[in-house]
Amino acid sequence: MKRVLITGISGKNGRYLLEEMSKNRERDDLDNIHFKVLLRESSDTSFLDECPLDIERYYGSIDTKEDALKFVDGEYDTLLHIAGIQRSVQIVSAAIEKGVKRFILVHTTGIYSKYKEAGEGYRQIDAKVKEICEEAKATLTILRPTMIYGSLNDGNISVFIKMVDKLRLFPVINGAKYELQPVWCKDLGKAFYDVLMNPEITDSKEYDLSGGKPILLIDIFKEIGNQLGVKNTFISVPSGIEYLGAWIVYILTFKKKDYREKVQRMVEPRAYSHEKAANDFNYSPHEFKDGVKEEIIMYKQLKETKNK
């Protein structure tokens, strides 16, 4: 491995990956590897300025195959794609054309959902990239994180934090008694690095990357409340009522707004074992109560700033 392409480096997961790269630079002889990273013009790149590694910055997008071909131009042997499953087909197709033979794609455990809208599209993308790599005799490793948290714009736990902070009477579907296993982005950054640096172990495999232990959604809410220092009264609402409400919205908007499947997914358990990753590269993620501390501190600091 001498020349590596990386997408998604400016996201929270990517920044923790870069942290691991910098930390292990001498031990793993990273000075002999050339990295090319994808950035948008609007990206904050200050975190790259003091990085001692050989990193080439490419500003652009990979929204189409034509865009992706510009990014992968050159002689590269490995692609680590963190920038979203929806762009996997075009970036893999482009990289194959340029001779890349090793792929690490960050996809999602959403592939396991029994609901069509949530899972079917992901399954189709998985199948397509596998077909492309198989035809090109390229190795493909797929990483599937669960619900990711650790950023105030993660769209997951950050939403829960705001809700817990603002709602003293807190409605929850079916008592919120179903298991999740959210994963801290710092644990993902380390996992991405370990997979990248251990091709002899991780090539051509698939790994679910979940958090430390399964946790009930109601316990997630309670832990957030404890760390925020607030008390909530949780009111259980039957899922049937929520689903009926989604149907009413669907009808009243003349089928323009369809929340039916989203409501169904809200009561779908999403806890997955990471035993395979633990066995292969010592993946050992934090438990939720420890990992979420940093995000709650960031939330409190932002709130204080706004209140000044």
Can you annotate each of these PLM segments?
Residues 3-27:
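N-terminal Rossmann NAD(P)H-binding glycine-rich loop of SDR-like oxidoreductase domains
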Residues 78, 89-141:
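Conserved Rossmann-fold NAD(P)-dependent oxidoreductase catalytic core, especially the SDR/UDP-sugar
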Residues 162-183, 191-195, 202-203, 208:
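A conserved pocket-lining segment of Rossmann-fold NAD(P)-dependent short-chain dehydrogenase/reductase
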Residues 198-258, 274, 280-308:
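Mid/C-terminal beta-alpha module of Rossmann-like enzyme folds, strongest
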